[in-house]
């Protein structure tokens, strides 16, 4: 994958564009993003570009340490967040929280 590209499931597009989703939680394979890096955002399903984001921080976290604050930044409840993470990464327990903001 292009090092300046990130994908999201289409269901998250509107939350990202509206500023309701300001973090993403990824596994080690996507932990190399750097603060201030500009990423082109595409849909996972169709590879359609829809935004640019700037990485604000990349912070390691264990699954059990996910909190209501993380869920709020994902625009979900904590049980929803934990369920989504386990659906996407069923074998993982260590993740990276990538905080971001939309850029023009």
From Swiss-Prot:
Keywords, sorted A to Z: Hydrolase
Segments forming domain ASCH: 7-104
Keyword Transmembrane: no
GO cellular component assignments: cytosol
Active-site residue list: 21, 24, 74
Primary enzyme class: hydrolase
SMART domains reported in the protein's UniProt record: ASCH
GO molecular function, one term: N4-acetylcytidine amidohydrolase activity
InterPro entries, sorted: AC4CH, ASCH_domain, PUA-like_sf
Record's keyword annotation contains Hydrolase: yes
Reactions accelerated catalytically: N(4)-acetylcytidine + H2O = cytidine + acetate + H(+); N(4)-acetyl-2'-deoxycytidine + H2O = 2'-deoxycytidine + acetate + H(+); N(4)-acetylcytosine + H2O = cytosine + acetate + H(+)
E.C. numbers: 3.5.1.135
Function: Catalyzes the hydrolysis of N(4)-acetylcytidine (ac4C).
Family from the record: Belongs to the N(4)-acetylcytidine amidohydrolase family.
Protein name: N(4)-acetylcytidine amidohydrolase
């Amino acid at each position: 994958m292009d090092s300046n590209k990130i994908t999201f499931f289409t269901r998250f597009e509107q939350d990202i564009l509206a500023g309701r989703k300001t973090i993403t939680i990824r596994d080690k394979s996507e932990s190399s993003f750097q603060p201030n890096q500009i990423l082109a955002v595409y849909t996972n399903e169709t590879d359609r570009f829809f935004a640019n984001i700037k990485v604000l921080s990349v912070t390691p976290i264990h699954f059990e340490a996910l909190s209501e604050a993380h869920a709020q930044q994902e625009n979900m409840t904590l049980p929803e967040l934990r369920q989504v993470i386990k659906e996407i990464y069923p074998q993982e327990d260590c993740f990276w929280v990538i905080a971001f903001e939309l850029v023009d």
